[in-house]
């Protein structure tokens, strides 16, 4: 008997402790974590500077409404602002960040349509869900919000056809579709989207899963020299303390005048204290190490797994990697066998094993994970 809604497919054990990149359950089992709490714990479970900052803030002030100045918000916003090119709005989650982005877009572009891509994922609240072009996510919730249009990801021809047919004001997308199957954006699609921006279409980049160092850059769009009009963050921003952020170019700041949007808990002192330490930690040296480990891990997985009959492809960027299986029915079985052997991983799409290890994981542990995957597959 549970008093909880059963909207999650929970596994039959509890995780009770975390250390660095390891998790421990209530039965005494130890797991090497290749999930990071679904891309949240980028600095692992023992990020001491973050813990110290949160504990100190808890002793000082745990909540402050947005009726007053908040220097901690200013500190974090400055670190995210790309040399003061963007203004920040803080909230509590990824879907809230995307809702803020969509509201701002509506104020700027009025009744023009927003284009989103099939298999993208932007959240489960109504606006974000309307932009999430996955039938399994939208099923049962019609009518969704109007003025959203779908097009296949990485399909330049389809994009051009949509632009000819519809009055598109903005495009929302991920650099790597995470929930959709760890599918990276293609170079020709990058150029097509930049061309859209040059024609006055807003680019909204969802960095909820790819941001905060996951791909070897602070933001994944930096790999492709994008300058998004709007981008969104959450998950790893405060390393386990719930927070989200929507950032927009300075020229759009006036659209969110007083009272146009808000959040009771957004940018609260505990989250900002943690986020401030996270952003201090993820400097250029740290990101170089993530890039190096990502290259090492992807090469290792390719060498060990590409010859397997069960593996169709291996793809990713930095420490965000997907292993596509030839038989989608094998995904739950592989995940279960990995758990039994002390490794936690995720699924994505319908046929992909998704690996999101903490960015602090060592090459020794990455190799251990690769060897176990080789054995299981």
UniProtKB/Swiss-Prot annotation:
One of its GO terms (biological process) is L-arginine biosynthetic process. One of its GO terms (cellular component) is cytoplasm. Its cofactor is pyridoxal 5'-phosphate. Pyridoxal 5'-phosphate binds at residues 94-95, 121, 206-209, 264. Gene3D superfamilies: Aspartate Aminotransferase, domain 1, Type I PLP-dependent aspartate aminotransferase-like (Major domain). InterPro entries: AcOrn/SuccOrn_fam, Aminotrans_3, Aminotrans_3_PPA_site, Class-III_PLP-dep_AT, PyrdxlP-dep_Trfase, PyrdxlP-dep_Trfase_major, PyrdxlP-dep_Trfase_small. It comes from the Bacteria. Pathway: Amino-acid biosynthesis; L-arginine biosynthesis; N(2)-acetyl-L-ornithine from L-glutamate: step 4/4. It holds the Pfam family Aminotran_3. It is found in: Cytoplasm. Its EC number is 2.6.1.11. May also have succinyldiaminopimelate aminotransferase activity, thus carrying out the corresponding step in lysine biosynthesis. Belongs to the class-III pyridoxal-phosphate-dependent aminotransferase family. ArgD subfamily. HAMAP family: ArgD_aminotrans_3. Homodimer. This is Acetylornithine aminotransferase. It comes from Lactococcus lactis subsp. lactis (strain IL1403).
